[in-house]
């Protein structure tokens, strides 16, 4: 349930997380997001997360993968860079199975996580990378839905159903944030962000977001914002919660605009 530490996120809050480039900026100073997303089972996640990242105003997207996934990403976004190099933030796990040894290709995707673990830049963990929550030294944001959060908590000997989490997202997001020392963005019809004892509540999401792939798009948007805000986040880790909420807010607003367009087309 909501308490005195919970506040509602607004468009003005989101605007404060948008870094506007200056005449002195270049592609590196505008933020570089390293992506380890997509797999043989879910190749679309690689394309969706990278494209969303680039559409959100990052200076560069570095996609890390085998040649097959890289070709798919480059076909949709030729400006993406598919060589390892310096990054200002990481996004990992979208479209990757959480069971590392489920098959050989998934194992290979998990091996890329070593790159991320060796650095100290802000990191976003989604889907198959959630098990790393609490194991990294850098500022970390996790973006689970209720089912993924239930599985993560079970790995820490806390038994709770996804239905219970959905019924009280604020409590469970807070508990997870405090347990693991990370920022938690718990996805749902009412998305919440928890950091320590602070909670940010997002406006109710449009049901048009209840489709496959929207989580990958959200991850890309948030990853881009984290990459562009990396200096602010390293100076003040509390900024990570604001940036995460801004990503969810932008994601929902984009979906609302897109759904209005579809409604007009059907008339």
Range-by-range predicted roles:
Residues 1-124, 131-141, 146, 151-267:
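Small-residue (G/A/S/T)-rich helix-start motifs and N-terminal tracts that mark the onset
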């Amino acid at each position: 349930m909501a308490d005195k530490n919970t506040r509602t996120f607004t468009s003005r809050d989101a605007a404060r997380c948008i870094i506007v480039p200056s005449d002195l900026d270049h592609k590196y100073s505008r933020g570089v997001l390293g992506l380890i997303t997509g797999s043989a089972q879910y190749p679309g996640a690689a394309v969706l997360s990278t494209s969303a990242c680039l559409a959100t105003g990052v200076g560069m997207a570095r996609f890390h993968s085998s040649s097959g996934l890289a070709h798919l990403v480059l076909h949709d976004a030729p400006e993406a860079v598919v060589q390892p190099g310096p990054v200002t933030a990481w996004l990992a796990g979208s479209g990757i199975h959480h069971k590392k040894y489920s098959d050989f290709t998934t194992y290979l995707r998990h091996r890329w996580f070593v790159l991320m673990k060796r650095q100290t830049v802000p990191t976003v963990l989604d889907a198959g990378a959630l098990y790393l929550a609490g194991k990294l030294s850098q500022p970390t944001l996790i973006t689970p839905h209720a089912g993924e959060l239930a599985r993560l908590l079970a790995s820490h000997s806390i038994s709770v159903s996804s239905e219970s989490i959905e019924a009280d997202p604020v409590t469970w997001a807070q508990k997870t944030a405090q347990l693991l020392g990370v920022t938690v963005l718990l996805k749902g019809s009412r998305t919440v962000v928890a950091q320590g004892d602070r909670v940010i509540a997002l406006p109710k999401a449009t049901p048009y977001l209840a489709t496959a792939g929207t989580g990958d798009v959200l991850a890309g948007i948030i990853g881009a914002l984290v990459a562009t805000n990396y200096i602010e986040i390293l100076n003040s880790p509390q900024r990570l919660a604001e940036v995460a909420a801004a990503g969810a807010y932008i994601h929902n607003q984009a979906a609302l605009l897109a759904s209005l367009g579809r409604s007009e087309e059907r008339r």
